[in-house]
Amino acid sequence: VVKKGIENLGFMVETPMSVRYLEEIQNYAKFLSVGTNDLWSLYTGKSRGSSDIREQVNERFGEVLKEILQKSMVPVSVCGALASDEEGLKFLLKLGYRSFSVSPSFFVRAVEIVEDFDG
């Protein structure tokens, strides 16, 4: 990939299988982006849009998200609705995540939450 002038190719962690093979994936990816919407949906069997985003703030899904951080050897960020929710962002910060993509309407509040985070 570098031969083609692309030095930073990342991988979206959105499926249980991608979590399972994370070590191998990182042999090629320079960074990871955790897609919480699809990942949560596939772990629970629920439709992406069928429930309140705060259902993702729970110990069981937290264990999956912690596993990703523990296995990561490259920078990891979170995208998806969980990072653009006040309780969701606090949850992710407590788990150890430090890089997020958030919606434009939530950006200012996200900055405030991160600045106020004590951890």
Can you say where each PLM-predicted feature lies in the sequence?
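Conserved alpha/beta-domain cores
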Residues: 1-119
